[in-house]
Amino acid sequence: MIDRFGRPLEDLRITLTHVCNFECFFCHMEGEEGDNYILSKEDILLVAKVAKNFGINSVKLTGGEPTLRRDLVEIVRGLKQLGYRDVSMTTNGFLLKDLAYKLKLAGLDRINVSLHAISRETFKKITGVDAFDRVIEGIKSAIDVGLVPVKLNFVVNRRNREEVFKFIELSQNLGVNEIHLIELHPVGLGKLAFKEHDDLREIEEYIEKISIKKQIRKKHFRPRYVLPSGLIVEVVKPYANPIFCAGCNRIRLSVDGKLKTCLYREDNVIDILDILKGEYSEDVKEELLGRAFMIAIAIREPNFKYKI
Ligand code: SAM
Ligand code: SF4
């Protein structure tokens, strides 16, 4: 399905929980508030089934910390059984060492692990937890079991900015395939943390110079740089960036049952909780959810647009 701004809808981002075992000072919580209701595995799979009918073929699981959901492995298995081509997850990696193999067996295709530091000290300053070594173990397990490509997310801010180039080195040594250098978004706690924002301009200029190839990804038109080692560095700069929004192919399912059309917008949402909780047959629920998707696609609009 294409929205009225010509953007295809291809990707469903599902928040599985708001609970987290870390306290990152900038956490945007996927732009969600309130979690009086937590969608069940059945709710999630039903919405995913309907999304699939709209041509959506890739799912990203997120949170909170998705590995804290006890039914995570079953959710992944259910998504693959629905026929999703690409099922991936973003995690803080704390529980990954023991989960990686189970997730791989359930069909998880690939993984993003957030690692915002190259040392125990900075890691703790950012996440509030002394877990750097443990997350590194998790990353190694993901590589070992073949959850590839393994990508690392690094949200750049004043506490870790000086570590970016060492982070690239560390990633190369670990053997990960790709890293994402992400601009801090002013959403959730990110609003307060925005004073520590870095626009990534200088960092990107330097990376471009040392790279051997530049590519532009279809999703968000994100620039990617291939380094001589083969490591891919993707630069994620959404803030006040109309080009990024023009390439947005994503819709979000919030943990409390809303179709959220944009990370930044709290108004552009369709509440589907009544449908999910309603005493309807599954066929009727599917029909109603389909209509909700149609409305969500109709109201979807880029948050940052060029002014004419
Ligand atoms: N707990 C998991 C994790 O940290 O990877 C998944 C949820 S987290 C909200 C999803 C991604 O958003 C992570 O890579 C995290 O670093 C990133 N993130 C969180 N707050 C952010 C912010 N204010 N700006 C940019 N990225 C942010
Ligand atoms: Fe937890 Fe992820 Fe938010 Fe950090 S960014 S507090 S790990 S949900």
UniProtKB/Swiss-Prot annotation:
<feature type="binding site">
    <location>
        <position position="245"/>
    </location>
    <ligand>
        <name>[4Fe-4S] cluster 2</name>
    </ligand>
</feature>
<feature type="binding site">
    <location>
        <position position="24"/>
    </location>
    <ligand>
        <name>[4Fe-4S] cluster 1</name>
    </ligand>
</feature>
<dbReference type="InterPro" id="IPR007197">
    <property type="entry name" value="rSAM"/>
</dbReference>
<feature type="binding site">
    <location>
        <begin position="250"/>
        <end position="252"/>
    </location>
    <ligand>
        <name>GTP</name>
    </ligand>
</feature>
<dbReference type="GO" id="GO:0006777">
    <property type="term" value="P:Mo-molybdopterin cofactor biosynthetic process"/>
</dbReference>
<dbReference type="GO" id="GO:1904047">
    <property type="term" value="F:S-adenosyl-L-methionine binding"/>
</dbReference>
<dbReference type="GO" id="GO:0005525">
    <property type="term" value="F:GTP binding"/>
</dbReference>
<dbReference type="Pfam" id="PF04055">
    <property type="entry name" value="Radical_SAM"/>
</dbReference>
<keyword id="KW-0501">Molybdenum cofactor biosynthesis</keyword>
<feature type="binding site">
    <location>
        <position position="20"/>
    </location>
    <ligand>
        <name>[4Fe-4S] cluster 1</name>
    </ligand>
</feature>
<keyword id="KW-0479">Metal-binding</keyword>
<feature type="binding site">
    <location>
        <position position="60"/>
    </location>
    <ligand>
        <name>GTP</name>
    </ligand>
</feature>
<dbReference type="GO" id="GO:0061798">
    <property type="term" value="F:GTP 3',8'-cyclase activity"/>
</dbReference>
<feature type="binding site">
    <location>
        <position position="248"/>
    </location>
    <ligand>
        <name>[4Fe-4S] cluster 2</name>
    </ligand>
</feature>
<feature type="binding site">
    <location>
        <position position="64"/>
    </location>
    <ligand>
        <name>S-adenosyl-L-methionine</name>
    </ligand>
</feature>
<dbReference type="InterPro" id="IPR013785">
    <property type="entry name" value="Aldolase_TIM"/>
</dbReference>
<keyword id="KW-0547">Nucleotide-binding</keyword>
<dbReference type="InterPro" id="IPR010505">
    <property type="entry name" value="MoaA_twitch"/>
</dbReference>
<protein>
    <recommendedName>
        <fullName>Probable GTP 3',8-cyclase</fullName>
        <ecNumber>4.1.99.22</ecNumber>
    </recommendedName>
</protein>
<dbReference type="GO" id="GO:0061799">
    <property type="term" value="F:cyclic pyranopterin monophosphate synthase activity"/>
</dbReference>
<keyword id="KW-0949">S-adenosyl-L-methionine</keyword>
<feature type="binding site">
    <location>
        <position position="151"/>
    </location>
    <ligand>
        <name>GTP</name>
    </ligand>
</feature>
<feature type="binding site">
    <location>
        <position position="90"/>
    </location>
    <ligand>
        <name>GTP</name>
    </ligand>
</feature>
<comment type="pathway">
    <text>Cofactor biosynthesis; molybdopterin biosynthesis.</text>
</comment>
<feature type="binding site">
    <location>
        <position position="114"/>
    </location>
    <ligand>
        <name>S-adenosyl-L-methionine</name>
    </ligand>
</feature>
<dbReference type="GO" id="GO:0051539">
    <property type="term" value="F:4 iron, 4 sulfur cluster binding"/>
</dbReference>
<keyword id="KW-0408">Iron</keyword>
<feature type="domain" description="Radical SAM core">
    <location>
        <begin position="4"/>
        <end position="224"/>
    </location>
</feature>
<keyword id="KW-0004">4Fe-4S</keyword>
<comment type="function">
    <text>Catalyzes the cyclization of GTP to (8S)-3',8-cyclo-7,8-dihydroguanosine 5'-triphosphate.</text>
</comment>
<feature type="binding site">
    <location>
        <position position="262"/>
    </location>
    <ligand>
        <name>[4Fe-4S] cluster 2</name>
    </ligand>
</feature>
<keyword id="KW-0411">Iron-sulfur</keyword>
<feature type="binding site">
    <location>
        <position position="27"/>
    </location>
    <ligand>
        <name>[4Fe-4S] cluster 1</name>
    </ligand>
</feature>
<keyword id="KW-0342">GTP-binding</keyword>
<dbReference type="InterPro" id="IPR050105">
    <property type="entry name" value="MoCo_biosynth_MoaA/MoaC"/>
</dbReference>
<dbReference type="InterPro" id="IPR006638">
    <property type="entry name" value="Elp3/MiaA/NifB-like_rSAM"/>
</dbReference>
<feature type="binding site">
    <location>
        <position position="13"/>
    </location>
    <ligand>
        <name>GTP</name>
    </ligand>
</feature>
<keyword id="KW-0456">Lyase</keyword>
<dbReference type="InterPro" id="IPR013485">
    <property type="entry name" value="MoaA_arc"/>
</dbReference>
<comment type="similarity">
    <text>Belongs to the radical SAM superfamily. MoaA family.</text>
</comment>
<dbReference type="Pfam" id="PF06463">
    <property type="entry name" value="Mob_synth_C"/>
</dbReference>
<dbReference type="GO" id="GO:0046872">
    <property type="term" value="F:metal ion binding"/>
</dbReference>
